[in-house]
Design a protein with these regions (language model features):
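N-terminal secretory signal peptides that target proteins for export/translocation
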Residues: 1-6
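Bacterial N-terminal signal peptides
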Residues: 10-22
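A periodicity- and composition-biased signal for non-globular, repetitive helical segments
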Residues: 11-13, 28, 322
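Signal peptide processing junction and immediate N-terminal pro/mature segment
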Residues: 20-33
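Sequence signature of WD/YWTD-type beta-propeller architectures
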Residues: 30-375
């Protein structure tokens, strides 16, 4: 399933250039030989300026980087990235420079530098972080060798599909913001990852396959008092607490394997509600910090003949009869690149996401000033 929170069940997308080429060829074939000299239809104006301003790339120097989150004061980001020196994602923090350019600051490695890592997040007090890591893998040397070989193969085939594996050696750790005082929080056999703090910092919601299927669990911030939140078939992951701490938003493919839908559930395990029900892949949901909106990534796969791009979508919601009720849906991005993993700054005025709208089509982090849709 998507790693995304970057967390993935299966292959989510091929490289952008290949997909664009395929869609172009389909269009030309449909035109037929008599349409060879026809002029292309005028391109519609982008919708992005309505919601996104001052778009800027804030990571560089990595083979790929993504899944970033803001610190509580909005001055630092934490994210995962692959350097040219190691085959797996590691966790980095990076200060944001003041002003419109935001960040070109030096990243700081805060994970161990070995193993696979993912799903980092700041504690609400800004003094600690959590992330998932497999650096305790007893066969780590062999795993690293396999990872290097895989990277070499991918370099020969730039159109490979990415697939997230549920590494059974993945555990959740906490640390100081500089990476010191590393502490293991989970000890179950199997995959433990996709973690986020509650607004008060007292609890952590995460995904685990300790019971068979990947489901959601909640534990105290020190790793104690673990309880299962969802009891569903398929994959259920990528959870985040709502700003008031009463709800958890997440993604699930319980209805159709590989077709993820956005769900919300009460922290008491009641009133599980699907906000989407379509033939697409909907994932990486995230709450707006001050207004009743949830943003996520979506691509429509209902028609296999049509290329579907991953874009960002925003839904307004309301609490009705003890449940989260879906409201108006607004598309936020329409760039030909892949746009995924959106998150808001603590004040809701900026949006950060992972995109391949780079010169070399690698995935990197972008930040933009954000405006909500007009009511």
């Amino acid at each position: 399933m998507p790693n995304i929170r970057a967390r993935f069940v299966a292959a989510l997308f091929a490289s952008l250039p290949l997909l664009c080429l395929r869609s172009t060829n389909l269009a030309r074939a449909a035109d037929g030989p008599n349409k060879a000299e026809a002029q292309p239809a005028p391109k519609a104006p982008s919708i992005e300026p309505r919601y996104l301003a001052n778009i800027r790339q804030v990571t560089s120097g990595f083979s790929k980087a993504g899944e970033g989150y803001f610190s509580p004061d909005g001055r630092t980001i934490i994210y995962q990235a692959i350097s040219d020196r190691y085959p797996f994602y590691q966790i980095y923090t990076q200060s944001l420079a003041p002003g419109k350019q935001d960040a070109k600051q030096e990243p700081k490695l805060v994970s161990t530098g070995r193993g696979k890592t993912t799903c980092s997040f700041f504690a609400p007090d800004g003094k600690s972080i959590i992330f998932a890591s497999s650096h305790l893998d007893p066969d780590l040397d062999r795993t690293e060798d396999a990872g290097r070989k895989k990277l070499a193969e991918e370099a020969k085939n730039p159109h490979h599909r990415y697939q997230w594996d549920f590494d059974p050696n993945m555990e959740i750790f906490s640390a100081a913001v500089d990476g010191s005082h590393l502490r293991r929080l989970t000890y179950s056999k199997g995959y433990d990852a996709e973690c986020a703090y509650s607004p008060d910092g007292r609890q952590i919601v995460f995904c685990s396959d300790r019971g068979g299927n990947p489901n959601l669990y909640i534990m105290d911030a020190d790793g104690g008092n673990v309880r299962q939140l969802t009891h569903e078939k398929g994959y259920n992951g990528g959870p985040f607490f709502s700003p008031d701490g009463r709800w958890v938003v997440y993604r699930s493919d319980r209805k159709h394997e590989g077709l993820l839908q956005i769900h919300v559930i009460g922290v008491d395990g009641r009133n599980d509600t699907a906000l989407t029900d379509n033939g697409g892949v909907n994932w990486a949901p995230y709450w707006h910090p001050t207004k009743p909106y949830i943003i996520w990534t979506s691509a429509d796969y209902s028609d296999p003949r049509v290329h579907s791009n991953f874009d960002l979508w925003l839904m307004k919601y309301e609490v009705r009869d003890g449940r989260i009720a879906a409201g108006k849906l607004t598309r936020i991005t329409d760039d030909p690149a892949t746009d995924i993993l959106p998150v808001f700054s603590p004040d809701g005025k900026r949006l950060m996401w992972t995109s391949t709208r780079t010169a070399d089509h690698t995935s990197q982090l972008f930040i933009a000033d954000f405006t909500l849709p007009q009511e």
